[in-house]
Structures are given as C-alpha cells and as structure tokens.
C-alpha cells in the first residue's frame, strides 16, 4: 500500500466512524425526546398510548384528589380543554390549583395521563416558557397582578 492509499483509508475510516457516532447520537436523542403539548393540542395531535410527552397548563380548580399513599389525581387545563392526570410521588411544594405545571409521562389505555414527574412554577412571576407561550397563543395569558 502506498502512502497515499494509507492516508485515504485512514480518512475514509475516520469519516465512517464519525458518521456512525453521529447516527447513534441522533437515534438515542430521538428515543428520549418527549414532545410538549397543551390540552387543546391533543385533539389534533396523534399521541399514542404509552408515547412519552410533556403536558403543560394550569392545575384546574377543584380537581385535586388525594388517593391512597402518594397518589394524586388532578386535571391540567389551558382553559379550553382539560386532561385528567394521575401522579404517584411527592408533589412540589408550590403545586396548587390554578398554577402552572408541566407533567411528563404517557397516556394509559383508559385515556388518563399517567405522569412520572410534575414541575410547578417557582413564584408569582415565573411560568414555564412552554406553558406561557401556549397560554399566550390561546389568548388566555394573564399578567401578574403583584407588580
């Protein structure tokens, strides 16, 4: 093998390795991706039972029900549509009615969203970006009254 052929084979091998690494990275990221939806978006989205998504909105007033142990049921709304959510675990301290939340999980076969994580807004001025953008797009955004 000449020097030129060796160099060419090293370059081709390096490019093949880089391409394989890039492909595996995108494949792994695609498997872990969870898409964000507001409750009203779910009517037009093709979300399959078991598919991981993030569901965001406001905790609907009067829907928080504490079950046995650490199980909690509540509804997430964007003021147009509501989705029933169940969660087993410790809720954030700031979780309460009419506050912004993002839940991550999947729909069960019964149509109830089974969350494995719940994130609540931090203070009266903070709202998760996805939730705020979704509420603004639906025309139901309310500015903070504490200013």
UniProtKB/Swiss-Prot annotation:
Pfam families: CcmE (PF03100)
Gene Ontology cellular component annotations, sorted alphabetically: plasma membrane
Compartment(s): Cell inner membrane
MF terms in GO: heme binding; metal ion binding
Binding site for heme: 122, 126
Membrane-related topology note: Single-pass type II membrane protein
Ranges in the topological domain labelled Cytoplasmic: 1-7
Periplasmic side, ranges: 29-147
Gene3D superfamilies registered for this protein in UniProt: Nucleic acid-binding proteins (2.40.50.140)
PANTHER family: CYTOCHROME C-TYPE BIOGENESIS PROTEIN CCME HOMOLOG, MITOCHONDRIAL (PTHR34128:SF2)
Protein name, UniProt field: Cytochrome c-type biogenesis protein CcmE
Species assigned in the record: Mesorhizobium japonicum (strain LMG 29417 / CECT 9101 / MAFF 303099) (Mesorhizobium loti (strain MAFF 303099))
Upper classification of the organism: Bacteria, Pseudomonadati, Pseudomonadota, Alphaproteobacteria, Hyphomicrobiales
């Amino acid at each position: 093998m000449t020097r030129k052929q060796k160099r060419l084979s090293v370059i081709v091998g390096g490019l093949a390795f880089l391409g394989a690494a890039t492909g595996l990275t995108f494949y792994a990221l695609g498997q872990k991706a969870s898409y964000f939806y507001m409750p009203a978006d779910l009517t037009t989205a093709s979300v399959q039972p078991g598919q991981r998504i993030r569901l965001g909105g406001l905790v609907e007033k009067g829907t928080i029900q504490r079950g046995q142990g650490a199980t909690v049921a509540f509804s997430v709304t964007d003021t147009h549509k509501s989705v029933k959510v169940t969660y087993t675990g410790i809720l954030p301290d700031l979780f309460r009615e009419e506050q912004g939340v993002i839940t991550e999980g999947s729909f069960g076969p019964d149509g109830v969203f089974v969350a494995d994580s719940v994130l609540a807004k931090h203070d009266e001025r903070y709202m998760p970006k996805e939730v705020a953008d979704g509420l603004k797009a639906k025309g139901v955004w309310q500015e903070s009254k504490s200013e």
